[in-house]
Amino acid sequence: MQNQLVVKRLGRRDYLPVWQAMHEFTDTRNEETPDEVWLVEHNPVFTQGQAGKAEHLLNTGDIPVVQSDRGGQVTYHGPGQLVAYFLINLRRKKLGVRDLVTTIENLVINTLKAYNIDSAARPDAPGVYVEGRKICSLGLRIRKGCSFHGLALNVNMDLSPFLRINPCGYQGMEMVQVSELGGPKDIALVEQQLVKELVNLLGYEQVEFSTEAEVREA
């Protein structure tokens, strides 16, 4: 199972049921369980990471705030943003946490390069940036040697809710998205490229695609 990856497309979902399903998957997986990547668009929500501080919630208005157990601080999820959750057995892949963070950042950088968008990681703030503007947020959690949570890549969305917070705890952090930089507006195209780059970076030999997932709507 080391080189098998299951990719699940969940469509548009509320945050909490997916969060709960990630926990259940991680708690019940064993050494034979294949790694999975879940691709999803969330309904509008602010999520506070474990390092989140209330003062970074400026004016959340009618958008709910959910406490999450991922790393990092506050961010926004909404339609038009590609969220990818990485349910990977790090021990089996012989990856450290820092290795995984670097792999995910390179995954996004390579994906954007396919659309002639030059981007880079920053040593002081996880994520991926284009000329100082943030295009991808990153937050992970490790349990029993396995990762969950993942990345949020802005593709073709309403960015204005980011003005209601200090994204990832940075006051005035400017956000940008793929469609503004000449890339596709279609999330499905970006998903395909992202999965292709992930398979290349982590050496999966067998990839199975699914639109089904055990995610119960609340």
Swiss-Prot record:
This protein's source sits in the domain of life called Bacteria
Q: What is its EC number?
A: 2.3.1.181
Q: Which Gene3D superfamilies does its entry note?
A: Bira Bifunctional Protein, Domain 2 (3.30.930.10)
Per UniProt, residues of the BPL/LPL catalytic domain are 31-206
Q: Name one Pfam family in it.
A: LplA-B_cat
Q: Which UniProt keywords apply?
A: Acyltransferase, Cytoplasm, Transferase
Where in the sequence is the active site? 168 (acyl-thioester intermediate)
Per the record, what is one GO cellular component? cytoplasm
Q: Can you cite a GO biological process for this protein?
A: protein modification process
The catalysed reaction is:
octanoyl-[ACP] + L-lysyl-[protein] = N(6)-octanoyl-L-lysyl-[protein] + holo-[ACP] + H(+)
Identify the pathway.
Protein modification; protein lipoylation via endogenous pathway; protein N(6)-(lipoyl)lysine from octanoyl-[acyl-carrier-protein]: step 1/2
Q: Which PROSITE patterns match?
A: BPL_LPL_CATALYTIC (PS51733), LIPB (PS01313)
Give the EC class as a word. Answer: transferase
Q: Where in the cell is it found?
A: Cytoplasm
Q: Which GO terms describe its molecular function?
A: lipoyl(octanoyl) transferase activity
List residues binding substrate.
70-77, 137-139, 150-152
The record places the site described as Lowers pKa of active site Cys at 134
**Which PANTHER family did the record assign?**
LIPOYLTRANSFERASE 2, MITOCHONDRIAL-RELATED, OCTANOYLTRANSFERASE
- Print the miscellaneous field: In the reaction, the free carboxyl group of octanoic acid is attached via an amide linkage to the epsilon-amino group of a specific lysine residue of lipoyl domains of lipoate-dependent enzymes.
What exactly does this protein do?
Answer: Catalyzes the transfer of endogenously produced octanoic acid from octanoyl-acyl-carrier-protein onto the lipoyl domains of lipoate-dependent enzymes. Lipoyl-ACP can also act as a substrate although octanoyl-ACP is likely to be the physiological substrate.
By sequence similarity, the record places it as follows: Belongs to the LipB family.
Q: Would you tell me the protein name for this molecule? A: Octanoyltransferase
Phylogenetic placement of the source organism:
Bacteria, Pseudomonadati, Pseudomonadota, Gammaproteobacteria, Vibrionales
> Which gene name belongs to this protein?
lipB
